[in-house]
């Protein structure tokens, strides 16, 4: 063997040993009474992969732009309909279908994310991503040309299937385009884009609806998607994938996709989400259909867990991955922080419209403080993690700021000052921005590159599930509290007329002038119940950042706090 080759082999062996020992407790030297944990960190990618094959210069700029455009599509499509729904229901005479415009999209997204994460481990990354993008665009075209409410719902469901593979695919393309130590900065760009699009969606939808047509909320996806498609086709080179072993039987090949687990997981998620969507609104919580959905969903989740244990490496989420402390801690963090973020994104515009009488566009503009805070913190954290190497401190800081800001939002009253609602939102935005992207950096730091697709899909799923579940929980809390408040404060009015016959922006049309102050106060107090749900979830993100390992993206060693 050539001496250089021998040195290289020795270095690779040393790196492997250090990686495998990252969390191994070691005894202190003789004469010391206690043991301590040494946390070893290293890049899980071979050096030659991390440097020689990464795109640079204009090519990297174009790929990063395409990834940010993808993130923009994902995020804005989630929120842009908020201000377009009144125009849609007016055209289709479909008030009863309002809930399905959002839930059909989220149901297919949440139930498909893990399956598509599995596809990324087997099939070519580029073409799997492009297929997901094409599916999303087809769904958008169906929505933009929909002649009826039913067709619009079908289009949203198809777009949701495509969306399920876009976030994890975009982050995987970034993973294979940027060295690990530089990824936090690029992750900050994608995180900032996500925040901008999520908060800009409602006012953008209002502009399209007022100036053009609600259908432009979907047409806008086509040119953005087309540009992204072309950039990825011509500039991104896929890494090698395992594909199918020719020696395997056809049954073994099919089992790589964990069909049994998938057939249990998808209906489980659909059952739980439908129960939360209908419970307390369409049906009572103790109604037979809601109870049945919760029971069936719970049983299927348990069965899915058993299948994952039996399937080993062919499981949708292999236990060897999810058992790693950083992975489950990051998933818990994303679930909780995603829940808080999406509840605020959904309910803050309603507060501005219902309590302060703002228009749809004005309510979107008044959420800009959260957007600015998000962008600033995302950019700052990306730079600092790149410099110092450690992401865990920013997860902790994100939890603290998001929790404090969310708690301050509970002080809202109809007469709250502009300085207060600007400042409180900015604090929440800073918290979300500091913490939002760090889990994606963390999983890339602690896992082998071949396991990153599954972990990335798991984190994306946790975000989506947290937001979906707790927007429904917050909606139930809001509706229940509003009914109680209206019965107590203005018994002369029928609560059903306020809840179902108009939106937050139409209170002055629905309510006689002498009762309006009491109804506005009831609206404020009820929305605080939704904010309380978000506050609890922001605090719960402490669980994730407490247990995440303190590893460095720069490959340095760090000693943990000595154990008692």
Swiss-Prot record:
It comes from the Eukaryota. One of its GO terms (cellular component) is plasma membrane. Pfam families: MFS_1. SUPFAM superfamilies: MFS general substrate transporter. Residues 1-17 have a biased composition (Low complexity). Efflux pump that may be involved in the secretion of leporins. Glycans are attached at residues 415, 524. Coiled coil: none annotated. The chain crosses the membrane at residues 66-86, 127-147, 158-178, 185-205, 216-236, 260-280, 287-307, 335-355, 368-388, 392-412, 416-436, 454-474, 528-548. It is found in: Cell membrane. The keyword Transmembrane helix applies. Residues 19-47 have a biased composition (Basic and acidic residues). Its main location: membrane. One of its GO terms (molecular function) is transmembrane transporter activity. Keywords: Cell membrane, Glycoprotein, Membrane, Transmembrane, Transmembrane helix, Transport. It is a multi-pass membrane protein. InterPro entries: MFS, MFS_dom, MFS_trans_sf. This is Aspyridones efflux protein. Belongs to the major facilitator superfamily. TCR/Tet family. Residues 1-49 are annotated as: Disordered.
